[in-house]
């Protein structure tokens, strides 16, 4: 922050501060940049995370990048790409955990199926745990989260490419707006749901999942930071509800809903998908109801109340966006089966459709609970006069 700069984020400037600098003779000399601490982390131990000290001996120089007081704007040019990268990395870790737990479930015999009388036949061979419904539920959850997360990352890449290759300013603006709308979700859903997914992968292994003999425990430690760095879940949620939803009088939200409606129309061409497209349509109406409930708080300047449950809104909104992606995937897969498209195997397309069903039947219903929390007039999380957290 340059002396005399405005208070708050508007007074932040961007500087390059090298470890070494050139002196007047052109030789390199130390720039008084030191490593103060090496943090001992829970996970992500493949690289160092350090605390740097600048100018401990009052002999450190930095070079201004761009204009004074524009640092935060410059940083966000990098930040959007970094947030997409976090979503991509979270998807990758969750994917590795899914396939590790899937392999284990296909190899580990444990327990027996119940007979029609509700008892186990001890003479029968033990079943592989992948045959047990509860284990299959945990595996399906992982598959739904992992592939749903990857679809978000690919959607962001698609919008970025369409913006970059747009033939008109109007088209460029459209895809930039759509990209801006989904970036908080692309960062947050793979991080939060991915952590939950890896947790289920670890659970598939039982006690072994907790031991270093298997890699699931490392995946769990490694993915946990994803909901923290490059903007915590709370910050992403406030960005979504406080800025993205309201920007340009809701233009971005209207564009996004328009894209979702296109998928619903495509899915409605397949009677097999009607119940799922109807479910997504209902969630869009529910989103409108939520915003109609919240907006009066923003309009009268009560932003604390408006944003109090932003993280819950993020969970709701993420389910809608990922559900949209899954419906698109299922519609394309069903059409490929009907067209006898041989690009991928029959089971590949079938697995996409069945995973979509899991998402809509097990994950999407959570959106209703989230909506009830958000629209509840109670303000239990807002601090009152007396502190009750004792």
Predicted segments, located by residue:
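Alpha-helix capping/hinge segments and adjacent helical runs
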Residues: 44, 155, 177-255, 358-384
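A short core secondary-structure module
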Residues: 1-30
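A glycine-rich, basic-preceded beta-loop-alpha segment at the flavin cofactor/substrate interface
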Residues: 22-36, 41, 48-82, 102-130, ...
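Alpha-helical support elements that line or immediately flank enzyme active sites
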Residues: 87-100
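Short, glycine/acidic-rich hinge or "gate" loops at secondary-structure transitions
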Residues: 106-121, 154-171, 202-213, 336-344
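C-terminal amphipathic alpha-helical interaction region
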Residues: 247, 263-390
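Short beta-alpha connecting loops at secondary-structure transitions
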Residues: 37, 75-83, 124-125, 133-138, ...
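Gly/Pro-rich turn-and-neighbor structural signature
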Residues: 132-203
């Amino acid at each position: 922050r340059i002396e005399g700069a405005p208070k708050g984020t508007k007074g932040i400037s961007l500087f390059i501060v090298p470890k070494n600098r050139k002196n007047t003779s052109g030789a390199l000399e130390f720039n008084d940049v030191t490593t103060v601490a090496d943090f001992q982390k829970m996970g992500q131990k493949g690289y160092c995370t350090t605390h740097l000290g600048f100018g401990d001996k009052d002999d450190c120089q930095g070079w201004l990048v761009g204009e004074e007081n524009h640092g935060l704007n410059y940083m966000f040019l990098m930040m959007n790409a970094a947030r997409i990268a976090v979503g991509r990395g979270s998807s990758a870790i969750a994917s590795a955990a899914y396939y590790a737990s899937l392999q284990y479930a296909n190899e580990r015999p444990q327990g027996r199926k119940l007979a029609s009388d509700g008892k186990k036949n001890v003479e029968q061979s033990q079943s592989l745990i992948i045959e047990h419904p509860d284990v299959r539920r945990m595996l399906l959850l992982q598959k739904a989260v992992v592939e749903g997360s990857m679809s978000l990352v690919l959607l962001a890449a698609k919008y970025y490419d369409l913006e970059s290759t747009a033939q008109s300013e109007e088209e460029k603006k459209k895809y930039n707006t759509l990209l801006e709308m989904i970036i908080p979700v692309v960062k947050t859903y793979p991080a939060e749901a991915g952590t939950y997914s890896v947790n289920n992968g670890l659970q598939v292994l039982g006690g072994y999942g907790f031991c270093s003999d298997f890699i699931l425990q490392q995946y769990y430690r490694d993915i946990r930071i994803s909901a923290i760095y490059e903007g915590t879940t709370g910050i992403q949620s406030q960005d979504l509800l406080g800025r993205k939803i309201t920007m340009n009088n809701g233009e971005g939200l209207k564009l996004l809903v328009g894209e979702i409606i296109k998928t619903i129309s495509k899915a409605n061409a397949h009677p097999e998908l009607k119940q799922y497209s109807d479910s997504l349509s209902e969630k869009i109406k529910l989103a409108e109801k939520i915003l109609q409930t919240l907006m009066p708080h923003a309009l009268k300047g009560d932003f604390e109340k408006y944003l109090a449950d932003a993280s819950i809104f993020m969970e709701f909104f993420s389910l809608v966006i990922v559900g949209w992606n899954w419906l698109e995937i299922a519609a394309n897969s069903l059409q490929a089966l009907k067209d006898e498209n041989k690009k991928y195997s029959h089971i590949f397309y079938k697995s996409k459709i069945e995973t979509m069903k899991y998402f809509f039947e097990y994950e999407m219903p959570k959106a209703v609970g989230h909506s009830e929390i958000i629209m509840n007039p109670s303000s239990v999380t807002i601090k009152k006069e007396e502190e009750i957290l004792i």
